[in-house]
UniProtKB/Swiss-Prot annotation:
Protein name as annotated: Pyridoxine 5'-phosphate synthase
Keyword match Transferase: yes
UniProt-listed GO biological process terms: pyridoxine biosynthetic process
Enzyme class: transferase
Residues annotated for 1-deoxy-D-xylulose 5-phosphate binding in this entry: 8-9, 44, 49, 99
Species this protein is from: Nautilia profundicola (strain ATCC BAA-1463 / DSM 18972 / AmH)
């Protein structure tokens, strides 16, 4: 099981003060030493965390393969092609969202996605599509020529939070109208859906990754799904690094995934 560590929120901390530290570039050696397999960054259209300057230096200096998340905006795709990361993961974007909400609609944006994939492939860049665990979306992902899909685990993660933490006693409530019995049932159904989606993806010749909202409490059941080859995790690791340091935070996540 590969672990991609998303370092966007190192840039978020830097940008909170609008200065030049912490520098995301400094994380690269730590990721390598801690056993990460990949560095993941998201070059958003609004540049709210990682900037073009960051992306260029990371792609040029990373010891590890770089997975760049991006929208299907042609201008962004051109930037990705110029930077030549190992992989581009196409994701949906809304400027008003706090974080990526839901997967990319491959059916609705098939033409635009095909154009993006063709351009990326012409620049020797692998393509992954960040999608909900929906059978129609998975089937279409194979048809448009992607090598990989990344299953959106956000619903699973939020159900786990609602069932197992105090999140609904905070301002950041999720699934607050569900009782515990319903939450448990929905969590089981979502995990089964992720398993079934993985099976379908593999049958269609796609590599399957997963990510979004995964943390130290909920990662193990997803890591245990046969057929998932990679997890991309960011916020939880960066948040834990405030208390443990980045290297130890990655090591702990790696141990959970491998255990």
């Amino acid at each position: 099981m590969k672990l991609g560590v998303n370092i966007d929120h190192i840039a978020t901390i830097r940008n909170a003060r609008q200065i030049n530290e912490p520098d995301p570039l400094m994380a690269l050696q730590i990721l390598k030493e801690a056993g990460a397999d990949q560095v993941t960054i998201h070059l958003r259209e609004d540049r709210r965390h990682i900037t073009d300057f960051d992306a260029g230096r990371i792609c040029q200096n990373s010891f590890l393969p770089v997975n760049m998340e991006c929208s299907i905006n042609p201008e962004i795709i051109d930037i990705i092609c110029s930077l030549k990361p190992h992989r581009a993961t196409l994701v949906p974007e809304k400027r008003e969202e706090v974080t990526t909400e839901g997967g990319l609609d491959i059916i609705k944006f098939e033409k635009e996605i095909k154009n993006a994939i063709e351009k990326l492939h012409n620049n020797d860049i692998e393509v992954s599509l960040f999608i909900d665990p929906d059978f129609e979306q998975i089937t279409k992902s194979a048809e448009v020529g992607a090598e990989m899909i990344e299953l959106h685990t956000g619903k699973y993660a939020n159900l786990h939070l609602a069932l197992n933490t105090n999140i609904n006693s905070t301002p950041f409530k999720v699934f607050e109208n569900m009782d515990r019995k319903t939450l448990k049932k929905e969590l089981e159904l979502e995990l089964k859906l992720l398993k079934d989606a993985t099976i379908l993806g593999n049958e269609l010749g796609l590599e399957v990754a997963a990510g979004h909202g995964l943390n130290y409490q909920n990662v193990k059941p997803v890591a245990d799904i046969e057929g998932i080859v990679e997890l991309n995790i960011g916020h939880s690791i960066i948040a834990n690094s405030v208390f443990l340091g980045l290297k130890q935070a990655i090591i702990q996540m790696r141990e959970l995934i491998n255990g």
